[in-house]
Amino acid sequence: KPLWRL
C-alpha cells in the first residue's frame, strides 16, 4: 500500500 496515487 503506497502512500500516494494507488
Curated annotation (Swiss-Prot):
Expressed by the skin glands. The modification Leucine amide is found at L6. It comes from the Eukaryota. It is found in: Secreted. GO terms for cellular component: extracellular region. One of its GO terms (molecular function) is toxin activity. Its main location: secreted. The keyword GTP-binding does not apply. This is Bradykinin-related peptide Pnor-3. Keywords: Amidation, Amphibian defense peptide, Bradykinin receptor impairing toxin, G-protein coupled receptor impairing toxin, Secreted, Toxin, Vasoactive, Vasodilator. Vasodilator. May target bradykinin receptors (BDKRB). One of its GO terms (biological process) is defense response. Belongs to the bradykinin-related peptide family. The lineage of its organism: Eukaryota, Metazoa, Chordata, Craniata, Vertebrata. It comes from Pithecopus nordestinus (Northeastern Brazilian leaf frog).
